[in-house]
Amino acid sequence: MMNLAEYRHSNARLADFLPWAALVDEGIILNKDGSFQRTAKFRGPDLDSAVPAELVAVAGRLNNALRRLGSGWAVFVEAQRHSAGAYPPNTFPDVASALVDAERRAQFEEAGAHYESSYFLTFLYLPPEEGAAKAERLLYEGRDRTVGADAREVLRGFIDQTNRVLQLVEGFMPDCAWLDDQATLTYLHSTISTKRHRVRVPEIPMYIDALLADQPLTGGLEPMLGSANVRVLTIVGFPGATTPGVLDDLNRLAFSYRWSTRAIMLDKTDATKLLTKIRRQWFAKRKSIGAILKEVMTN
């Protein structure tokens, strides 16, 4: 990437804040921090006909697939609610089928605006730093110890790992497939723009951030994306236990929105270190009985 510090020292446009840099393989984005990401489009089981035991089983199998990812990995799950557009044209071999479709088309047009949901699963992997990569090479025989991490080797490992995870997900998802280059750019464009259209892959797939950012972002108390107002809703605290499909009512809302959930993975050892650090910080905040009595008497 070109060093823009010679021309501009501060971020001025939306593209400056986007992480995407280039397409390095089919549907795989290289980010500015050296991480790789790829996205799959999926559709889960029908919640109206599925029994609770089936949904619990699906949630358990999904957890078993994602728990294989450790430190350096992040998973993003997004649901997009968008306009369904016009009724699709169809041809039928007989008059009876055409009449049934005509009645269905009339009901579709009388109902007014229609919305549908699309679901995306994004995997992101940030390789270890150069020093950690060199230390890892010393632990295995037959590896070149004179150079650092090979970018092609890291990319092949990322592709292999994500393919294995998606194969597990395909076993219980009715529809699940990786996005190609054009579908990936189209999806990323839909996350930062209100204009819904396909994005053609450029001849040199570089500077994806500037290619996709076609609307200005205005911050402040009343944020806007282009001419559209943006409102952000976040959940401060999740309950201790939930049931699968608890947010299914969001699929019936008659307006456009994006629901995004992120999970940052940690190895067991890294998670233990983090919990120990947090526990020590809380333990350091303890107060003696004398300090409590002093606060009560002075206040």
Question: Where is each model-derived feature located?
Answer:
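Extended, folded cores of ATP/NTP-driven motor/assembly subunits in large transport
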Residues: 1-299
